[in-house]
Design a protein with these regions (language model features):
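Glycine-rich phosphate-binding loop
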Residues: 338
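FabD-like malonyl-/acyl-CoA
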Residues: 121, 341-346
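Short Gly/aromatic-enriched secondary-structure transition segments
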Residues: 32-39, 218-219
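Short, charge-rich binding segments
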Residues: 37-38, 47-50, 97
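Gly/Ser-rich oxyanion-binding loop with an adjacent helix/lid
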Residues: 1-34, 68-73, 79-194, 324, ...
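C-terminal nucleotide
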Residues: 2-24, 45-81, 174-330, 345-387
Length: 387
């Protein structure tokens, strides 16, 4: 807090860009599916001043080194360094706007945890800061699209809109529901009859980089499944980048799944079953049925393990432990499910017992993570904003 107070005095502007959790709608945004999510009350803080010239100078309280570049120059080749996210934000903004003024600032993350879309939170903070410095007014969904494009085209992660939408559009009193095909979205307010809950984040101790994981491979497998269905039914093939499972009716999948390689059939099965779970989950949320909503989140994780085939031994162990604990309504892997964390919706009265038992059982299986396994408790919050 002392560091934050000092930075607030030192810099004119402060952006808070929250992390996000997705209880339902995992691994389907890149196929134009339906997703849900929350922004949470932990995230990334960016303090900055606007420069009179085009120079960008950034420091991090989380990572070593400094970042320096010119905002009006073409983006250089990605350096696989934390500064790539600032360069990616510049890259996507310069495709739309003229950028003349840079910033001087400091960025800091509040949780050392993978699986909460910290990269998307950082990108959104930079997009908002560079827009502010150059007197560019962006609507929240414009921020979503620009940040997603930066991560996809510059960072190299073939994501959809889920992460950025939760971070930019989230509200503390409701659940984000987004159709990644039409980009229609709404906040579904909490039903007054819904029980109280908090969100547990159970960090496995493993860190990860999605660019170097099987994340992109899974995206290609989903598209290949879609191509298989089009080919087996003699429909015209689209280019790979324009091929999405959302465009193919489930009835077509039911007819063709036996003919396609099992791997691709499993990826498609996850997509279509997750579509159904999100629909059911939205109804459960609207009616205040947190027990059903939680069960659907558990079922989503089962499909992620067996159909989408993600999840490290560590994450699967956390999931299997928390599924048996009293007070856990539901939960799943957070993010892509390659290392990182699990999230759970829990009854606050059981928090202490859940943390104690889960920690004991997990470390009994994986004692090597005794110093890095962590449990955090968070709540839904509003999306990215100037503080």
């Amino acid at each position: 807090m002392a560091i934050e107070n000092k930075l607030m005095k030192e810099y004119q502007y402060h952006i808070f860009s929250p992390y996000r959790v997705c209880p339902l709608g995992a691994h389907v945004d890149h196929q134009h599916g339906l997703v849900t999510g929350f922004a949470i009350d932990k995230g990334v803080d960016l303090w900055f001043d606007v420069c009179e010239d085009s120079h960008v100078h950034l420091e991090s309280k989380t990572f070593e080194g400094v970042v320096d570049f010119e905002i009006d120059a073409p983006s250089q080749v990605r350096e696989r360094h934390w500064g790539d996210y600032a360069r990616g934000a510049k890259f996507a903004l310069r495709k739309r706007f003229e950028l003349k003024r840079g910033i001087t600032g400091v960025i800091q993350g509040s949780l050392p945890v993978g699986g909460l879309s910290s990269s998307a939170a950082v990108l959104i903070a930079y997009v908002m800061a560079f827009a502010k410095a150059n007197d560019i007014t962006l609507q929240p969904f414009e921020v979503v699209k620009i940040a997603s494009e930066a991560e996809r085209e510059y960072i190299g992660l073939n994501n959809g809109l889920l992460d950025q939408a939760c971070i930019a559009l989230g509200k503390k009193d409701g659940l984000l529901f987004l159709d990644c095909d039409s980009n229609d979205w709404r906040i579904i307010k909490r039903n007054p009859e819904m029980p109280e809950f908090e969100i547990g984040i159970f960090f496995s101790g493993l860190t990860r980089s999605l660019v170097n994981s099987d994340y992109n491979l899974r995206v290609y497998e989903c598209k290949t499944a879609a191509w298989n269905m089009l080919a087996y039914t003699d429909q015209p093939l689209k280019t790979f980048d324009k091929t999405f499972l959302r465009d193919i009716p489930k009835a077509t999948f039911d007819k063709t799944r036996i003919a396609m390689p099992a791997r691709f059939a499993r990826r498609a099965e996850h997509f279509y079953s997750e579509y159904r779970r999100v629909r059911q989950g939205v109804t459960a949320w609207e009616t205040g049925n947190l027990k059903l909503f939680g069960k659907l989140s558990f079922d989503s994780c089962e499909s992620s393990i067996h159909n989408y085939e993600c999840g490290s031994p560590e994450l699967i162990a956390i999931y299997e432990i928390m599924r048996q604990l009293p007070g856990v309504y539901g939960g799943r892997f957070s993010g892509a499910g390659f290392k990182g964390a699990c999230i759970a919706l829990v009854d606050p009265a059981y928090k202490d017992d859940i943390e104690k038992v889960l920690t004991e059982k997990y470390l009994a299986q994986f004692p090597e993570y005794e110093k890095t396994f962590q449990v955090f408790w968070v709540k839904p919050d509003d999306g990215a904003r100037f503080v």
